[in-house]
Regions:
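A short acidic, amphipathic alpha-helical/loop segment
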Residues: 20-24, 66-69, 92-94
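Short loop->beta transition adjacent to catalytic acidic/histidine clusters or analogous donor-positioning motifs
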Residues: 3-5, 25-34, 52, 75
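C-terminal catalytic/acceptor-binding lobe
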Residues: 163-279, 283-296
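Short beta-strand/turn micro-motifs composed of small residues
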Residues: 9-11, 36-38, 189
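Short beta-strand-to-loop acidic/aromatic patch adjacent to the donor-nucleotide binding site
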Residues: 75-85
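Short, well-formed alpha-helical segments that are part of the catalytic scaffolds
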Residues: 11-27
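Active-site-proximal specificity loops/subdomain of glycosyltransferases
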Residues: 37-73
Length: 296
């Protein structure tokens, strides 16, 4: 069983906040997979760190992109959010709890339960709420766990990005998978302030809490054992590191600067551009992008 500590985050228009989140956890792990959704600005220096695999994508799957590398990973898989600060013992604590339960449960610090189904609102109908920012006095099993503070071993849970059929509801899809596969999600005891919040202008909760019809319909289907609603996809699953399928996400001016040695070239690492294999950095990705841009 692999002991590799793999941290994963998908970020959308929160570069400054993302940097703070990464700074809080980078010394606690072996690998960090970072997806920048619809990013066309500067690349901060921390994303050239040897531990970081940087990927560019559109935003068609939103927060689900933190699970993009799951089916290619072996070890303890931790998913984080770009608006949270993690304590120095966070990874150690989460992995210790996984081991305490024999790596048979998904661990989280955030979750919700519903007393019965059908519910009228995924965001507003919960009868029990456990927040990562507040104290949770004892371990409790939850129906839906927060993926911003989640940890499990890949021997327990491994699925492809196709499983996430709609964006910005990763908590719901993981809840579905765990129910179908009889995996308990355990929201762990922790004190208030263990996780700290970086204030944001907008959040997924702000965007979705008053428009959660799809989340509600899916949650009801899961727990009433009914077919899932038909979910149309206007786009293919986003593919990272390949220009021909994500042309709108590339800032060519910035890539030109990098390619011409104006920005952090010495801090890049080799990238595997085969999407079916695990990326390992940034340098070859930039070179391939520039090659295609120049018609090579």
């Amino acid at each position: 069983m692999s002991e590799t500590r793999i941290v994963n985050v998908a970020s959308y228009n929160r570069i400054e906040s993302l940097v703070k989140s990464l700074e809080s956890i980078i010394d606690q792990c072996d690998v960090i997979n970072v997806t920048l959704n619809s990013h066309d600005g500067d690349i901060p220096e921390i994303l050239y760190h040897d531990k970081i695999n940087l990927m560019l994508s559109d935003n068609s799957l939103g927060d689900a992109m933190k699970f993009y590398m799951l089916d290619k990973s072996d070890g303890y898989y931790l998913t984080i959010d770009d608006d949270l600060i993690y304590p120095p013992n966070y990874v150690e604590y989460m992995i210790a709890k996984c081991k305490e339960y024999g790596n048979t449960r998904v661990m989280t610090l955030h979750g919700r339960n519903f007393a019965s189904f059908p519910i009228t609102s995924y965001y507003r109908s919960a009868t029990e709420r456990y927040a990562c920012l507040n104290a949770v006095k004892k371990n409790v099993i939850v129906q839906f766990g927060g993926t911003g503070v989640m940890c499990f071993h890949t021997d327990l849970l491994k699925l492809g990005i196709d499983y996430f059929m709609a964006p910005n509801m990763a908590d719901v899809w993981i809840g579905r998978y765990c129910l179908d596969n009889k995996i308990e999600i355990l929201c762990l005891r922790h004190e208030s302030g263990f996780i700290k919040y970086i204030p944001q202008k907008t959040t997924i909760y702000d965007q979705e809490s008053n428009n959660d019809g799809l989340q509600t319909e899916i949650a009801n289907a899961i727990y009433q054992h009914k077919p899932l609603p038909i979910i149309s996809r206007e786009k293919a699953i986003p593919v990272v590191s390949k220009l021909e399928r994500t042309p709108s996400t590339i800032n060519y001016e910035k890539v030109n600067q990098i390619f011409n040695g104006q920005t952090h070239v010495g801090k890049t690492r080799q990238v595997n551009n085969n999407i079916n294999e695990r990326p390992t950095g940034n340098a070859q990705m930039i070179q391939k992008l520039m090659g295609k841009r120049r018609g090579r």
